[in-house]
């Protein structure tokens, strides 16, 4: 595998690119993905480079998104996968209400309109164990907030998909 320079800008572009594919703003055709990735690189005031080890490569970014969308776990969810979904929760503890808000990168909903699977795209090149634990906790919080059954942490660069299950059962809960 080619060396890839990670970083915040790469993550922003990958998230935006995959969001635009899911919303239909950009097609999955390779040329369209490359062109849009190059536009996004330039919008950050950078110039696209050929070698992803030295900067932001439109070809590498487009290929990463295409590979991610083709992963079996993601391909199976694609027909109902919604991008950038706000999640909220309020919890009262000892008379103090705490509100939590976030944005799930993508999720699916069941026939009843309730979230089923929460997907979190991660662009890290080689995350360490502590980072992965943080990601699991983040997705578990989204599961608890939404009542979704399971979450997927998708490490886009490596193509690894990690399953996260909710901490509490959502079966039979009163609505």
Task: Outline where the language-model segments fall.
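Nucleic-acid nuclease catalytic cores
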Residues: 98-103, 108-169
């Amino acid at each position: 595998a080619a060396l890839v320079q990670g970083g915040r800008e790469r993550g922003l572009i990958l998230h935006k690119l995959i969001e635009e594919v899911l919303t239909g703003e950009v097609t999955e055709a390779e040329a369209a993905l490359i062109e849009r990735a190059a536009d996004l690189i330039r919008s950050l005031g950078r110039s696209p480079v050929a070698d992803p080890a030295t900067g932001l490569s439109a070809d590498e970014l487009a290929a990463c998104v295409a590979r991610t969308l083709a992963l079996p776990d993601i391909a199976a969810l694609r027909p109902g996968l919604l991008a950038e979904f706000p999640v909220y929760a309020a919890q009262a503890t000892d008379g103090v209400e705490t509100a939590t808000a976030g944005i799930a990168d993508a999720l699916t909903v069941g026939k009843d309109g309730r979230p089923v699977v929460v997907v979190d795209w991660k662009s890290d090149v080689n995350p360490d164990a502590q980072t992965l634990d943080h990601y699991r906790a983040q997705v578990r919080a989204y599961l608890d907030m939404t009542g979704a059954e399971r979450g997927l942490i998708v490490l886009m660069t490596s193509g690894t998909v990690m399953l996260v299950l909710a901490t509490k059962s959502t079966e039979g809960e009163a609505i």
